[in-house]
Amino acid sequence: MADDATRKAVSDIPLLKTNSGPRDKELWVQRLREEYLALIKYVENNKVADNDWFRLESNKEGTRWFGKCWYIHDLMKYEFDVEFDIPVTYPTTAPEVAIPELDGKTAKMYRGGKICLTDHFKPLWARNVPKFGLAHLMALGLGPWLAVEIPDLISKGIVVHKEQQNN
């Protein structure tokens, strides 16, 4: 399914141990600590590999996440807001990542700008509960989705670089 670079990136992300979601207040704090450590490691590895492509932060409870993701195409940076909520059944249920400004612009997206991860990512997530976390969601979910969809949307003229919008 994944190319060698993706396999390498994912193998360098720490696996999570705590099987807890937001309903379990005490264990959720431990799970969040693991999530942050894995995300930090993934971002650090991406920076070393000159592949830095997102920033995330969460609300105080760790149940709502938001930030920016970007994709470089023909040496131009396309930046998008990204957001998702942690489902109450997390980690059994993967979060649904949304890029609101792309809502309705591709068939591989649900209402509200939620990207389609059903065919490839969700079965992989299900096989790896509770070891996979948000860093894995980014590496195996959003990253590949951006790599396929953004160049296609650019080639169709649906996504236009901000410098070209004013022309």
Curated annotation (Swiss-Prot):
GO biological process: protein K69-linked ufmylation; protein ufmylation; response to endoplasmic reticulum stress; reticulophagy
Range of residues in the leader sequence: none
Any GO CC annotation of this UniProt entry: cytoplasm
CDD domains linked: UBCc_UFC1 (cd11686)
Key words of the record: Ubl conjugation pathway
MF terms (GO), sorted A to Z: UFM1 conjugating enzyme activity
Pfam families noted in UniProt: UFC1
The UniProt record lists the keyword Nucleotide-binding: no
Location of the active site: C116
InterPro entries according to UniProt: UBQ-conjugating_enzyme/RWD, Ufc1
The organism's place on the tree of life at top rank: Eukaryota
Role, per record: E2-like enzyme which specifically catalyzes the second step in ufmylation. Accepts the ubiquitin-like modifier UFM1 from the E1 enzyme UBA5 and forms an intermediate with UFM1 via a thioester linkage. Ufmylation is involved in various processes, such as ribosome recycling, response to DNA damage, interferon response or reticulophagy (also called ER-phagy).
Annotated family: Belongs to the ubiquitin-conjugating enzyme family. UFC1 subfamily.
Subunit architecture: Interacts with UBA5 (via C-terminus). Interacts with UFL1. Interacts with UFM1.
Name of this chain's protein: Ubiquitin-fold modifier-conjugating enzyme 1
